[in-house]
Structure formats: C-alpha cells, structure tokens
Amino acid sequence: MACRCVDCGFVLSESSVHWPTCKPLARNVIKTPETSEAPGARNKQAFTLNGGSGTHLDAPAHFIPGGRTIELITPQELVNVSLAVVDVSDKVARDADYRCSRADVENDERAHGAIPAGSLVCIRTGWAEARYGNRSDYYNAVDASDVDDYTGLPRMHFPGVSLDAARYVVDGGARGLAIDTLNPDGGFSDGSPVHHEVLGRDRYIVENVRLGPELPARGWLATVAPLCVAGAPEAPARFFAWPAATHWSIGLEEVAEAAVAGIKAAQAKKRRREA
C-alpha cells in the first residue's frame, strides 16, 4: 500500500514566523535565465535567515552551555520516530494562555494508551492551524504597553506546556517535544523553564509545527529533518508524518510496473543504438 504522508511543517518564506526580535528570511536573486546571457544560465539565489525561522528544531545547545548542536543529533533520534499527539485545543479555545498540564497528558494516556518511550510528543493546541498566516495574530501581543520583564517585549499570549507536563513526558522517555506555537513555554514565562527542562536533559524541541486534525493520538511515525549546520543551536526543519502500518511499502503491482518500464526503456535505448 502506498504511503499517505503528511507535511507537518510550514513553507519557509519572507513572511514566515520568527522570534519578534529576529530578522525574517532575506532573499538575494543572483541570476535567472532571463537576466543572464551565459550558456546554460540557471536560477540561483542566496538566503539569509534566522535559525529559528518557521518550523524549526531547537538542539540542546540553544539553551544549555556545552549542549549538543544540530549536527550532533543522530538520525536515530529523528527518523521513524513514534508520534504521540496530545490535544488540548478545546482548552486553548477558551484560554489563549493555557498550558498543557501533566493531567492533560495523563488523561490522554488513559484514553489512548501509554506514550511509548522514544516518542516525539506533540502538543496540539490548534494555534498554528488558526493563526500561522498572520504574525500579529500568532504573537498575540494585545497590549503594547504591557511589557514582559523576561523578554523585554510586549507580552505575548499563546499557549504552551507546563513544566510539570514537560518533566513528565521526558521522565517517560520522550525523545523530543513538539508544539504548534512559537515555543513550548507559552507567550510569557519566567526563565523559559520548559526549554531548560527538555534541552537540559539532552532532548530536542520542534516549534511552529502544523498539527492538523488528521494526525491521530497514536499509531503514526515521523521524521524531522533540520538543516544540518555545524555548530548551530537551532535550524529550520522539514517534518513529515505517516501511518506506522504503511512503512513506506509499495505493492507487488507497483514493483512489477517499475520493472516492466525499466525493461521497455532499455529495449528502446538498444533500438536507438542499432538504428
């Protein structure tokens, strides 16, 4: 059976979400076929972007001195990882500052089974699905005069994860924590405790993830593929998820069709040589 794969990341562009004090992606179009008379002219661009742009992965070094940087996170930690999705979107709909609690995670486990060790635990708040296309709505800093002492920015209001919940999933063996908001600490926090808890225990965090309703609580796998920049504490990433039962398998009919197509192509090439 062909695999149904879901892209859980957002397209990276000049309008992508990033931390408010950072610069957005900047693009320099070096040349195009239309602007070059050189033979074999091609499109070529250069980009400048913040490591925390759009859907991205935080390595331990993002907050932890001496912590691992992006290139030191192994493929085994990122590829074919069991996905566990904890949905608190109904509570966030009533309270933009809601933090997923340990009780929420425990209730999810009672309903769907224990979160397997080694999972990437995703907290679905519904925030990105509803607001990602508009930075102002996504940051939700409703009062510019209300300045957050910790960030020095107008206080943002978006959901996150409680420290107790983060500690609980890491204690349970979670490989990483993902969320569909700007960060798992929520719109305002004193000292980014969730970052320190998760990254301080040598796990990773994925932020600004698309966690649509098609993702079930259990039974899917994921691969997170950050841009592998040496020494980087964070990097933009692709994030794919698919049902575990498919395992990217293809049917015998598809194999046979590919084999027949290859034989026909070889025969056609032989006829051209002999002509």
Model-derived regions: residue spans:
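Active-/binding-site microenvironments in catalytic and ligand-binding cores
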Residues: 1-275
